[in-house]
Amino acid sequence: MENRHGLLVDFLVTTASGTAECAVVPSVMDDLRERRFHPETVGLDKGYDTRDLVAKLRARDVTPHVAQNTAGRRSAIDGRTTRHAGYAISQRIRMKVEEIFGWLKTVGGFRKTRHRGLEKVGFAGYLVGAAYNLVRLARLVATPTPA
């Protein structure tokens, strides 16, 4: 998600596993750079707080704004990141991603897909994501009507 306007930047469907998400993030960052989109930061939830992922993102000159997972261990995010005002802002804006998922599931009808296979589900996801962006763009450019 792009922070300024809340637009969906990329959408990827993977197999359901506990570690697939962390393995995919670096390749998504590489794909975004190939499309000339150079994010300086990426906001992620607690499930992405691993030393390996944080190191891979920093190697790509992307600052990981990962929610700290301190349940029984030390977080991979240190004070270099958390002391900046941008980190706090990113953590607040991160909740908008959940709003996108809510829209995709309710309005977009993507709660229970009727397709099978990663390719078909991924294509359907791109269509629903594009519809979300169109609705979002329409709201952004809409002129308010005088009362």
Model-derived regions: residue spans:
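Anion-binding and metal-coordination hotspots
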Residues: 1-147
